[in-house]
Structures are given as C-alpha cells and as structure tokens.
Regions:
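N-terminal amphipathic/basic leader segments beginning at the initiator methionine
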Residues: 1-3
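Residue-level marker of positions within ordered structural domains that often coincide
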Residues: 6, 31, 139-140
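Short amphipathic alpha-helices and their capping/turn segments at secondary-structure boundaries
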Residues: 6-18, 122-130
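N-terminal active-site beta-alpha-beta segment that forms phosphate/nucleotide-binding
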Residues: 11-75
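"Short basic amphipathic alpha-helical interaction patches in structured regions
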Residues: 38-47, 81-86, 148-153
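Acidic low-complexity segments
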Residues: 62-116
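Conserved, well-structured core segments that form the ligand-binding/active-site neighborhood
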Residues: 92-209
Length: 209
C-alpha cells in the first residue's frame, strides 16, 4: 500500500497532491466483494490506516478526512459490518460525522454532471467533486471491476446505474467479464469520461489504489 501511494502509475505521489488545508474523501468497496469476516485483518482497514497516516504526514487535518462506503444501490453497511471491515479503532476515530455510506436517494449527497455522448445520465456522490482530493480504495478483484466502474457505479444513483445494470448491455456485449468487448464496460467508461472532464476543469483527478 505504501508503495502504491508513493509510486502510483501515471500519477504524482499522494503526499504531493494534498496540503494542510485539503479536504479528502476515501471511498471504499462495500460488502459485495468480501462480506465475510476474515481470519486476517481486512484489507480495507490495513489500507485506510496507511492512507490516513500518509495524509496526516502531508499536513491534512484529521477533521478534513472522510471515509465513504461506495455501495451503489446495495444496502448500507451496519455498524457491526463497518467494524468488521475497518476495525473498531477507525470507526471510533472517525465517528458518524466522518464515516458514512453513500445514499443514492439523498439529493443533498448527489450531483448530476450531465450526459454521455449517447445520452446516458451521469450522477454521482458530490464528494467526488467537492473534495480537494478524492481517493478510491478498490478491494474487489474481478474482470468487470476497476476503473471508472468504481466511481460511476459505487457512488452512482438509479438514474445513472439503470443504463448498464439491465439485460441489454450484458446480452449485447458477450460478457461483463470481457473488458474489451463488454457493452457494460463501455457504458461505464462513457460515464467515467464525463466525471473525468468535470474533475479536470477543477484541476483534479481520482487517486485510485
């Protein structure tokens, strides 16, 4: 994790992207990828502790760091599940004001960014845009996962997710596990392009681990 933060691919090190007054959101995967209690420490806890340590060393105040569970349209995590994934220490350290689940039905959390070139909605949690640095911690290893799917789906809404979470993209694209030919993946990438252009206008990028 430390190596990924210090030597990211095609990106500046995390420590150079933030400063003392920066606001940071760390989004992480929900229970759909790893929902059972492991004998070893959950990677979410291990990684987030390292990320927070790096941010603090860069001068970011603890009160300016938010942890956001990106569960898309899945149910929200319970406190017990949060403690299983993140450990009681992190849960108590951040509390309910700084540790929360994405709410795809709360208009105050959401922002509509526009449409893709084919007219598909792009709507995500506003933390993606409002944070000085948005970080996504990906812990689900699957061919259909990764890239813009993390943000566009994990922090999306019904309005935007409905375009690719239905039979047509899966049937037309052979398999969602085939990134090159997957219609699902292409739709998500189109939405990601809108997110990226919006962030670029603010001089920002998503930092993915």
């Amino acid at each position: 994790v430390r190596d990924a933060i210090s030597n990211p691919i095609s990106h500046e090190p995390l420590g150079k992207l933030v400063g003392p007054k920066a606001t940071v959101t760390i989004a992480f995967d929900d229970a759909s990828g790893s929902y059972f209690q492991t004998q070893r420490d959950d990677f979410r806890r291990v990684a987030i502790e390292v990320i927070v340590e790096e941010l603090r060393q860069a001068g970011v105040e603890l009160g300016n760091i938010r942890l956001l569970c990106a569960q898309g349209l899945h149910r929200k995590l319970s406190r017990t599940e949060m403690e299983t994934f993140l450990g009681r220490k992190l849960v108590l350290q951040f509390g309910y004001n700084q540790l929360y689940c994405h709410d795809a039905e709360d208009p105050d959390q959401l922002v509509h960014l526009g449409y893709t070139r084919r007219g598909f909605d792009v709507e995500v949690n506003r933390a993606v845009l409002d944070s000085d640095q948005f970080i996504y911690l990906n812990t689900m290893w699957a061919p259909f996962n990764g890239g813009w799917k993390l943000t566009a789906v994990g922090l999306g809404t019904f309005r935007s997710i409905r375009h690719h979470h239905r039979p047509w993209p899966a049937a037309k694209g052979n398999s969602v596990d085939d990134p090159k030919n997957s219609s699902f993946k292409k739709l998500v990438w189109e939405q990601g392009e809108v997110i990226q252009k919006t962030l670029e206008r603010k001089g920002r990028r998503v930092f993915t681990i």
